[in-house]
Amino acid sequence: MVSSFSSKRLGDTMDSLALGSNWAGGVAIVLFLAPLALHLVSSYLFPSTSTVINSGRAWDIFRTTAKKRFRSDAARLLQNGFEKSPDAFRILTDNGPLLVLSPRYAREVRSDDRLSLDHFIASEFHPDIPGFEPFKLILDPRNPLNTILKTSLTQALEDLSVEVADALSTALTDDSEWHEISPCQTALKLVAQMASKAFIGPEKCRDPKWHNVIITYTHNVYRAAQALHFWPKFLRPIVARFLPACQTLQAQIAEAREILEPLVAQRRADRACRAAQGKPVPSRADVIDWLEDSHGDQPYDPVAAQLLLSFAAIHGTSNLLAQALMDLCTAPDLIRDIRAEITSVLGDAGLTRAALYRLKLMDSALKESQRLAPNRLLSMGRIAQSDMHLSDGLRIPRGTTLMVSAHAMWEPQIYPDPRRYDGYRFYKLRQVPGQEGQHQLVSATEKHMGFGYGKHACPGRFFAAAEIKVALCHILLKYDLEHRGGGPPPRVWSQGIHLFPDPTARIRVRRRKEEISL
């Protein structure tokens, strides 16, 4: 199944690596350090014990060709790797060598404290380089964001419906004639507005400038991080000074501070005033106040925290919503059945957390979309903090970067006819006695690692699932959907191990009279 995903280049890599007007100084530095680079890179990238699937040619000291091939054809490389070595192999990624493990190792990796997720994320996103400051929070033991994602955010669900209705009125309009829309752009707008309501409250949640910052910062983080990956680690802080993508990140953080810091200051002043008057200080149901409560008098950077939350919450959620919309367009009978489920469940209970849980067919359709197009081909990224051996004797040296393949989601022994979208698949599995709770969208298992697996499974998956379900309730009740005629359904795009819905895809929608009012 991995090889069935289409692989398309998303822009000219060399443009991303341009060093701007100061290129001459950067080149001089690189030439000066080249002899040292020769020694360090060759010894670091290719230790004698490594067998690398795409090692490249010996003369390519920075392995640029191998890295480019990984970014453009990772699915095929991974398939070749498992054909040669079904349990584990090494592959050269754009960020160095990676040990790829079979899904059978997922249970061992999921809870081993010698394997660090935090250090893996830090290695991907350069927290010590200007522009990437939000990622410093990942290594801060006081960071409360995981707790907020797991627990507090679910308190904000009641407000999401209002934001979806507002966003849809402009994104899809009230036009009762068929018209085309971009599912990717529509999903981004909806998720950005819903997340903003939960993260920063009502004052700025509809601010288009804030939406633009949190959407484009995530895109630019990936662009800048991947551009830096083409350089040896010891050169990246130097290269970043001249890299336009890194300069863009710094400008966006400054813009985020201009928007958010006055709001945070006003909140703090209001809280201090109430406390001085002896009045109770209420905590609003948004991340600004939850961060204030959790930090107390300890200093922290609220803007960095908001950008990190947005990075984690927006694009993955919007990608799943967009993919689900495109998949549903291939299954009009499924749309009809989900619409009937929404009408029945919400007609009785209204739009509540309990009602969202009862939308089991919708949940199944979403989980199936995620099965076919997860955010990554590989999951459970870790860095070994000490030398270790797995149960079968596989040795993992200290400092090894590893990930577990997600290809169990496309195994016919686990999911019959795995290439086919079947929105009823997980609904039927939940009818099996004893498996009612094992096949929910938020269930993270070794057979479905769409949200990861183990103690580091995505902490925001409950909030993400709720956002998407609220959005789909509005969309399916209020609009008819169909694919634009004249061709097959859009295919999933890939870059490296990352998967995402076709950003050029269009679907047709028209306003309909909803059976119940939300």
Swiss-Prot record:
GO MF, one annotated term: iron ion binding
Binding-site positions, heme: 458
Pfam families: p450
Keywords in alphabetical order: Heme, Iron, Membrane, Metal-binding, Monooxygenase, Oxidoreductase, Transmembrane, Transmembrane helix
PROSITE patterns with a match to the protein in the record: CYTOCHROME_P450
GO cellular component: membrane
Record GO biological process: secondary metabolic process; terpenoid biosynthetic process
Pathway(s): Secondary metabolite biosynthesis; terpenoid biosynthesis
EC numbers, comma separated: 1.-.-.-
Biotechnological and industrial applications of this entry: Pyripyropene A and its derivatives have very unique characteristics of selectively inhibiting the acyl-coenzyme A:cholesterol acyltransferase 2 (ACAT2) isozyme. Therefore, pyripyropenes are expected to be developed as a new type of anti-atherosclerotic agent. Furthermore, pyripyropenes have been shown to exhibit anti-angiogenic activity against human umbilical vein endothelial cells. Finally, pyripyropene A also exhibits insecticidal properties.
Cofactor(s) the record lists: heme
Gene3D superfamilies: Cytochrome P450 (1.10.630.10)
Membrane topology designation: Single-pass membrane protein
Function: Cytochrome P450 monooxygenase; part of the gene cluster that mediates the biosynthesis of pyripyropene A, a specific human acyl-coenzyme A:cholesterol acyltransferase 2 inhibitor. The first step of the pathway is the synthesis of nicotinyl-CoA from nicotinic acid by the nicotinic acid-CoA ligase pyr1. Nicotinyl-CoA is then a substrate of polyketide synthase pyr2 to produce 4-hydroxy-6-(3-pyridinyl)-2H-pyran-2-one (HPPO) which is further prenylated by the polyprenyl transferase pyr6 to yield farnesyl-HPPO.
Family: Belongs to the cytochrome P450 family.
Protein name: Cytochrome P450 monooxygenase pyr3
Species of origin: Aspergillus fumigatus (strain ATCC MYA-4609 / CBS 101355 / FGSC A1100 / Af293)
Gene: pyr3
